[in-house]
């Protein structure tokens, strides 16, 4: 991203090109809910695959799991979500607007608060600082009430025998409760990790900022189990691995990221160390990726309530202990939003022409190639090339409009390479390939069209 862009520009661009659609649009939509269109679905899957390759598939001690969205409600009792997973809400008596009390304080004062700060302290800070309603500018507040963020539902077919259950607010707990199963069936010794990609649900009071904060979202989480004495080293290793993934693999600009290592007084109750990666979104710097040392908190909590041992036996020392856990956690949509913002650019080509270009790495791009016949008379040859390419690469076919307009369309959706089929192609079996970022062109044999080979050719041509 060459300059700061506003959210409206980003949203309009990705809606217009089929990355996202407003959820339930024909029924006037559902607030802050989005469906991923054809291009958004492709790039989302590409992102998940890159995460899996970097964090899971490339390491022998890493395992993948896919747990249920609905778990026994005792899971959420043990984890503390039923009692503590809530936002402090406060209402303006004048205009009836509702806000998170902690957000009001953070946005209007320099007071230091955290998730352990009680309601009495929060209301005193609001009163002492005479914080006004952002909507009507009055200062007439209700008491603070706690609002649990979990969606509840019921299972069972008979009304008076239905059981209360919850849609999971995070994927982590499904990993914790399967710790023993994974360790036993995979014959795994410490240290080892378990990753999961899956849906989570939070009844957010203030969702918004496009796909940054929604009530339904996907998480990519890892719980890495280790001996407590090894946890600092494991933590630092994940810290470097996340940096490598963001800056080397995804090519996100480092100047758009802040890395915050929180002091102990600002840590969550379960964490002994937390580092957040903040991205410079259109609405400001906000959390992109979290890395936490959760210690023995989760396994101990589940062991205590379930009365089942979640201890690990060191076969060499015969010592039994509850493992420590290091957790890197990122939201798929949030990371995707950062990638799209970072890749979006508006360029001036000459005095009369501009272009919007999405400078995605080829591994993320929805399509790697676009096949563009110069004339309808070349469709048969172009379709032959397309059909061969589709077997090994995701590609698209575009025969509508001038070649210049087709180039611009592919630039705007992030296609790295356009393959132009011209009349000479019928004679020499060669095509012209255009590079998205440099707009340079090279001519190669059809049989030589391969993503890695094309990348190398343009690299050497620069």
UniProtKB/Swiss-Prot annotation:
One cellular component (GO) term of this entry: cytoplasm
Keyword Nucleotide-binding: yes
Residues that hold ATP according to the record: 202-204, 212-217, 287-288, 331-334
Record-stated family: Belongs to the class-II aminoacyl-tRNA synthetase family.
Primary role: Catalyzes the attachment of glycine to tRNA(Gly).
Source organism of this protein record: Malacoplasma penetrans (strain HF-2)
GO molecular function: ATP binding; glycine-tRNA ligase activity; protein dimerization activity
Name assigned to this protein: Glycine--tRNA ligase
UniProt cross-references to InterPro entries, sorted A to Z: aa-tRNA-synt_IIb, aa-tRNA-synth_II, aa-tRNA-synth_II/BPL/LPL, Anticodon-bd, Anticodon-bd_dom_sf, Gly-tRNA_synthase/POLG2, Gly_tRNA_ligase_bac, GlyRS-like_core
């Amino acid at each position: 991203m060459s300059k700061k862009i506003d959210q409206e520009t980003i949203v309009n661009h990705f809606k217009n090109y089929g990355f996202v659609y407003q959820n339930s649009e024909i029924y006037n939509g559902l607030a802050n809910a989005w469906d991923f269109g054809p291009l958004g679905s492709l790039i989302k899957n590409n992102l998940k695959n890159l995460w899996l390759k970097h964090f899971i598939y490339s390491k022998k001690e890493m395992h993948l799991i896919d747990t249920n969205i609905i778990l026994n409600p005792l899971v959420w009792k043990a984890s503390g979500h039923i009692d503590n997973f809530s936002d402090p809400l406060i209402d303006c008596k004048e205009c009836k607007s509702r806000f998170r009390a902690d957000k009001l304080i953070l946005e209007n004062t320099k007071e230091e608060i955290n998730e352990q700060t009680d309601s009495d302290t929060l209301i005193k800070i609001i009163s002492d600082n005479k914080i006004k309603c952002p909507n009507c500018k009055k200062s007439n507040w209700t008491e603070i009430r706690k609002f649990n963020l979990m969606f509840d539902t019921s299972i069972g077919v008979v009304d008076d025998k239905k059981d209360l259950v919850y849609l999971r607010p995070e994927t982590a707990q499904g990993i914790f409760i399967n710790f023993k199963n994974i360790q036993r069936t995979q014959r795994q010794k410490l240290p080892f990790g378990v990753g999961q990609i899956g849906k989570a649900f939070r009844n957010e009071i203030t969702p918004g900022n496009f796909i940054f904060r929604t009530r339904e979202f996907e998480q990519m989480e890892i719980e890495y189990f280790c001996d407590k004495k090894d946890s600092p080293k494991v933590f630092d290793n994940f810290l470097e691995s996340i940096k490598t993934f963001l800056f080397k693999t995804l090519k996100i600009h480092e100047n758009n990221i802040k890395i915050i290592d929180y002091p102990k007084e600002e840590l969550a109750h379960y964490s002994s160390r937390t580092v957040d990666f903040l991205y410079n979104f259109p609405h400001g710097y906000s959390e992109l990726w979290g890395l936490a040392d959760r210690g023995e908190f989760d396994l101990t909590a589940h062991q205590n309530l379930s009365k089942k041992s979640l201890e690990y036996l060191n076969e060499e020392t015969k010592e039994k202990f509850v493992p420590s856990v290091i957790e890197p956690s990122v939201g798929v949509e949030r990371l995707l939003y950062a990638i799209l913002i970072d890749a979006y650019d508006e360029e001036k080509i000459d005095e009369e022409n501009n272009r919007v270009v999405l400078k995605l790495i080829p591994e993320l791009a929805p399509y790697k190639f676009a096949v563009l016949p110069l004339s309808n008379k070349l469709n048969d040859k172009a379709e032959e090339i397309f059909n061969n390419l589709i077997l090994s690469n995701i590609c698209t076919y575009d025969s509508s409009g001038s070649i210049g307009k087709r180039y611009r369309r592919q630039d705007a959706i992030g296609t790295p390479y356009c393959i132009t089929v011209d009349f000479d192609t019928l004679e020499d079996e060669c095509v012209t390939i255009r590079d998205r970022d440099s707009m340079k062109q090279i001519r190669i044999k059809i049989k030589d069209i391969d993503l890695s080979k094309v990348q190398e050719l343009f690299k050497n041509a620069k």
